[in-house]
């Protein structure tokens, strides 16, 4: 008060006004809490509701638009005559049902309901604590030494001041262990033993409920906080951070609620956070004592070939496909990285051997070439498929097995629900007697095997992981001397020794990863790009890092600013097994003009006559140290598969999914940096993309023609994808 006597009244008024106008500083944790979506505090059980057998248990219901609104009212107990422990959101009727009980309450049971989603407050059902356990509201009522707890509203045998009425919001119910003051040691209780006043309860930390093995890829525990204490963002939410790890898209990754997971091969489990300034952080989860792994978690170890994606490959191949030696995993030269033996202890990162520690498409390594960061060891053969597996003959149109999952793990959708979509892309009435339940089938005579529809709007359909029966193989040689079907209708691969081109190549695409050119591609529709699978080595890469540049001649966009179009990639669609193709769906359609155009696809199954002159395009390595960044073209002529095999000294046997082309006399052709680019041929004055550049066996080697993916063999698949996948409107 002495200050008011010393300061003139005017000065005091100005001081008070200044203090009132000062911005309020909100601590980070508190600020985060205010922005927090309360739905993160609930455990979701999809297509589930609760049925109460006890008529005395109350229920409150009201129409609301979203589950988030239901959660907000449940957490705040706003307008509810009880403490809300769970709620059900009726998606069909847009209605909330709030409960003072949950699935663990006596006289309550779960029941399937397609239109319902059950959300239970985690604090009331979790069997572990976070930090000091101040939020724990579970039902443990035994102390660490096994003594039964005294009820909180009782004074026998111990008198105390911890009455439920004095600690509202702390849930001092029954005789359950609690930590109302957030003290060290965790939840506790007064005991029923007159000799022991109180004792802590033996409730584990959530980080210790389930330990992790290896890098935690199989961790399915309940940890929902990062190692710095930040709350995890729900996997089925896109705020505050947008991401691609949607539960319906990755059903086998354990994306339950907002629990820590490791879907992309990081050193350990992590999660997106609710802090807008911190996209993601690692979680503190203890390692299992003996790092034992379930049999289902361990990839099959091989040394001479790769099984699946090669995650279990333990051989000694130590060069990438073109012979460049691998960098040691424990070295940071010439490439710095965090995929070290210390971070990936169970991935056998010995020496410089090819490995697949992060779930990429196949074994790979960092290379000793400073200009090539990563290379794939695609020269390692695939292991033979066991004849005992479920298999199909021909193209699988008569397959009648019971498999009902796609190659990406999605459950197939019932055929009867998708007949309208099926009729949209076939011109005959399918045999409904074969379309049993949701089993994999091939009603449209797809050349690449059985498939099914899914319930995922992002992936309307996909192939099933069924292989052709042993002994029933595709013909390996295509004789191009026979009458042919006309094709026309009424690390980086680079073109070596090509010449600069400014011809009309508006369909040519430069794919950028973090603003660096990595691959070529072809614009085949306004919203679709055809490129090579090797350009996207992992399904788990964030598509936000990729851009498609169109309308450019210079790979850096110099001088092309007015005509350049830069588009984001919204989705990858992987081609049939073994195709090496990828279709990219653009976030918005390209605008066709004088500088951007589409290129035609060939007729399905067509072949181009031998000695037809075609062209490959790319921005890759040119054989010169001073690469000018300009688009290059190299002219090649089509070569029959049998003759092509001879040029490769019989070491390569081509099949009908491949096409061969080589240069006449001069050393010219695609090389590192042009993956995904097109082999373009002209027939009846119509230019078409006949091939796609994929990793070969060296760059423009004399008398060694290039082998490309034959687009005509996959033309029906491309048309089917374009027809069935919805286009995002900008």
Curated annotation (Swiss-Prot):
Residues 495-723 form the Peptidase S1 domain. Belongs to the peptidase S1 family. Plasminogen subfamily. Disulfide bonds join 70-96, 74-84, 128-206, 149-189, 177-201, 211-288, 232-271, 260-283, 305-383, 326-365, 354-377, 391-469, 412-452, 440-464, 487-606, 519-535, 614-681, 644-660, 671-699. Transmembrane segments: none annotated. The modification Pyrrolidone carboxylic acid is found at residue 32. Glycans are attached at residues 294, 402, 568, 655. Dimer of an alpha chain and a beta chain linked by a disulfide bond. Interacts with SRPX2; the interaction increases HGF mitogenic activity. This is Hepatocyte growth factor. Residues 128-206, 211-288, 305-383, 391-469 form the Kringle domain. Potent mitogen for mature parenchymal hepatocyte cells, seems to be a hepatotrophic factor, and acts as a growth factor for a broad spectrum of tissues and cell types. Activating ligand for the receptor tyrosine kinase MET by binding to it and promoting its dimerization. Activates MAPK signaling following TMPRSS13 cleavage and activation. One of its GO terms (molecular function) is chemoattractant activity. InterPro entries: Hepatocyte_GF (IPR027284), HGF/MST1 (IPR024174), Kringle (IPR000001), Kringle-like (IPR013806), Kringle_CS (IPR018056), Kringle_sf (IPR038178), Pan_app (IPR003609), Peptidase_S1_PA (IPR009003). SUPFAM superfamilies: Hairpin loop containing domain-like, Kringle-like, Trypsin-like serine proteases. Keywords: Disulfide bond, Glycoprotein, Growth factor, Kringle, Pyrrolidone carboxylic acid, Repeat, Serine protease homolog, Signal. The single-chain precursor undergoes proteolytic processing by TMPRSS13 resulting in an active two-chain form. The single-chain precursor undergoes proteolytic processing by HGFAC resulting in an active two-chain form. Residues 1-31 form the signal peptide. The keyword Repeat applies. GO terms for biological process: cell chemotaxis; cell morphogenesis; cellular response to hepatocyte growth factor stimulus; epithelial cell proliferation; hepatocyte growth factor receptor signaling pathway; liver development; myoblast proliferation; negative regulation of apoptotic process. Residues 37-123 form the PAN domain. One of its GO terms (cellular component) is extracellular space. SMART domains: KR (SM00130), PAN_AP (SM00473), Tryp_SPc (SM00020).
């Amino acid at each position: 008060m002495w200050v008011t006597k010393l300061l003139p009244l005017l000065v005091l008024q100005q001081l008070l006004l200044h203090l009132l106008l000062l911005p309020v500083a909100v601590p980070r944790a508190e600020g985060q809490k205010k922005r927090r979506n309360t739905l993160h505090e609930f455990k979701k059980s999809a297509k589930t509701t609760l049925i109460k057998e006890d008529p005395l248990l109350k229920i409150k219901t009201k129409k609301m638009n979203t589950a988030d609104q239901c959660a907000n009212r449940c957490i705040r107990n706003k307008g509810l005559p009880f403490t809300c422990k769970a709620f059900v959101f009726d998606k069909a009727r847009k209605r909330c049902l709030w409960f003072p009980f949950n699935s663990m309450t006596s006289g309550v049971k779960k029941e399937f309901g397609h239109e319902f989603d059950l959300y239970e407050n985690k604090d009331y059902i979790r069997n572990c604590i976070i930090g000091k356990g101040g939020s724990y509201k579970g039902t443990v009522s035994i102390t660490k030494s096994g003594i039964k707890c005294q009820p909180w509203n009782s004074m026998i045998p111990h008198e105390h001041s911890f009455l439920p009425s004095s600690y509202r919001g702390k849930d001092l119910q029954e005789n359950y262990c609690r930590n109302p003051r957030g003290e060290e040691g965790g939840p506790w209780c007064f005991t029923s033993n007159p000799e022991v006043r109180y004792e802590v309860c033996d409730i584990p930390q959530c980080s210790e409920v389930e330990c992790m093995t290896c890098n935690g890829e199989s961790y399915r525990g309940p940890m929902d906080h990062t190692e710095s204490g930040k709350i995890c963002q729900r996997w089925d939410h896109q705020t505050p951070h947008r991401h691609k790890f949607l539960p319906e898209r990755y059903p086998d990754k354990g994306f339950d609620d907002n629990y820590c997971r490791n879907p992309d091969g990081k050193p350990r489990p992590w999660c997106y956070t609710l802090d807008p300034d911190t996209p993601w952080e690692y979680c503190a989860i203890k390692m299992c004592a003996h790092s034992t792994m379930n049999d289902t978690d361990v990839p099959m170890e091989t040394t001479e070939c790769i099984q699946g994606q090669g995650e279990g490959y333990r051989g000694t191949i130590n060069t990438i496909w073109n012979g460049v030696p691998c960098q040691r995993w424990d070295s940071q030269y010439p490439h710095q990285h965090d995929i070290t033996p210390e971070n990936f202890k169970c991935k056998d990162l010995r020496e410089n051997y090819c490995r697949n520690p992060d779930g990429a498409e196949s074994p790979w390594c960092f290379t000793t070439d400073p200009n090539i960061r990563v290379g794939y060891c695609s020269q390692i053969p695939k292991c033979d498929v066991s004849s005992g597996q479920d298999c199909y003959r021909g193209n699988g149109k008569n397959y009648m097995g019971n498999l009902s999952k796609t190659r990406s793990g999605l459950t197939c959708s019932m055929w009867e629900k998708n007949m309208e979509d099926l009729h949209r892309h076939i011109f005959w009435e399918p045999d409904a007697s074969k379309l049993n339940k949701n089993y994999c089938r091939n009603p449209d005579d797809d050349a690449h095997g059985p498939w099914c529809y899914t319930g995922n709007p992002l992936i309307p359909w996909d192939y099933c992981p069924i292989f052709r029966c042993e002994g029933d193989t595709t013909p390996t040689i295509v004789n191009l001397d026979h009458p042919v079907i006309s094709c026309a209708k009424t690390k980086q691969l680079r073109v070596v020794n090509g010449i600069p081109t400014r011809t009309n190549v508006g369909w040519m695409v430069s794919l950028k990863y973090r603003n660096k050119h990595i691959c070529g591609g072809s614009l085949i529709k306004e919203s679709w790009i055809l490129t090579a699978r090797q350009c996207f080595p992992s399904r788990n890469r964030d598509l936000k890092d990729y851009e498609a540049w169109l309308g450019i001649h210079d790979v850096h966009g110099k001088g092309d600013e007015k005509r350049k179009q830069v588009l984001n990639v919204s989705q990858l669609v992987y081609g049939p097994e073994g195709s090496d193709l990828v279709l990219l769906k653009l976030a918005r359609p390209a605008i066709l003009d004088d500088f951007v155009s589409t290129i035609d696809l060939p007729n399905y199954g067509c072949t181009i006559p031998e000695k037809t002159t075609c062209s490959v395009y790319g921005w890759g390595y040119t054989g010169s140290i001073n690469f000018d960044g300009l688009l290059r073209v190299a002219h090649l002529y089509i070569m029959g598969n049998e003759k092509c095999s001879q040029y490769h000294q019989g070491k390569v046997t081509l099949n009908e999914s491949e096409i061969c082309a080589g240069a006449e006399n001069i050393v010219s052709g695609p090389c590192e940096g042009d993956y995904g680019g097109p082999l373009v041929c002209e027939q009846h004055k119509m230019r078409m993309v006949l091939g796609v550049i994929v990793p070969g066996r060296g760059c423009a080697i004399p008398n060694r023609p290039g082998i490309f993916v034959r687009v005509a063999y996959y033309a029906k698949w491309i048309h089917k994808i374009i027809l069935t996948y919805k286009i995002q409107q900008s």
